[in-house]
Amino acid sequence: MHILVLGGAGMVGRKFIERLAHDGQLGGKAIDKVTAQDVVAASAPAATPFTFDAVVSDISVEGGVDDLIALRPDLIVHLAAIVSGEAEADFDKGYRINLDGSRHLFDAIRKVGGGYKPRVVFTSSIAVFGAPFHDKIEDEFFTTPLTSYGTQKAIGELLLSDYTRRGFFDGVGIRLPTVCVRPGKPNKAASGFFSNIIREPLNGEEAVLPVSDQVRHWHASPRSAVGFLIHAATMDTNAIGPRRNLTMPGYSATVAEQIESLRKVAGETVVKRIKRVPDPVIDGIVAGWPRNFNAVRSVQLGFKAEASFEEIIRVHIDDELGGNFVK
């Protein structure tokens, strides 16, 4: 089995590839090769039971993905994107990478022909939904994004559905919750503070909170995000039907509930490292995001996430900090 990971140098891509290296198989099929594409070289896991190839390329340019698709990978995991804040700040770059990149990928698959029909897992986002919201967004809620990033992902979902309907590939779109707690340094995502206010205090560093304590959002851990990819790659897609884009399960919490969970897990000294510095730009972006979901379809189809924000924090401590933190 040959797996192509687009955006393989990013956090979720790295963790997905590490999971593949650990398991050595996917859905009961042995993995022969993993190709990790990105604009920078992806690092190989410490030990891989398969051939690993890191390819540096730009799928947002015409023909930028053709050579990779010519290899006819069995599974394509499309993670390549720029994040929400950057897509909002740079309109042209956002559409070039988040939309043109997906369109070039889908067309490259279509043009191979000869019965080639890979599984394509496309990572979308809950940013495809826009206000006004219900208290809980049901699976039937319409997509009216209020950011450029959300619009780019919504268009990608439509393309995925149509190319799947036409038989060019077997696509599954997964709308990721905000992935929290993200390891590493802060990125340009408008949602980055959700992770920052947990990660930095646990590392003994101060974190900036730019929004109100009452902001509510939908979260899942990096561990769950990898689990979503694994399940989307291996599931029986006949059970999905024609509605190929699914809202992933997660846990809804206010910022205040996040902080209280951190207090329960790590103590008051850690919580005191959070500093409130309001940012109206971030606040405005987040105000247009959904807060809570009733993700019935994905749960019925076997997708799983954490059941509390305390669990999300403990996953981060276990997976990234070796079970310890700075008290």
Report residues per predicted region.
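N-terminal Rossmann NAD(P)H-binding glycine-rich loop of SDR-like oxidoreductase domains
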Residues: M1-L26
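Conserved C-terminal active-site "lid" loop/helix of NAD(P)H-dependent oxidoreductases
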Residues: S43, P222, D279-F303
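NAD(P)H-binding glycine-rich loop region in Rossmannoid oxidoreductase-like domains
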Residues: I59-I97
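Conserved Rossmann-fold NAD(P)-dependent oxidoreductase catalytic core, especially the SDR/UDP-sugar
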Residues: R103-T147
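Active-site Tyr-X1-5-Lys
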Residues: A131, L146-V172
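NAD(P)-dependent short-chain dehydrogenase/reductase
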Residues: S161-H217, P222-G227
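Mid/C-terminal beta-alpha module of Rossmann-like enzyme folds, strongest
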Residues: P201, S224, F228-V286, F325-K327
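Amphipathic terminal alpha-helices
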Residues: P290-Q300, A307-K327
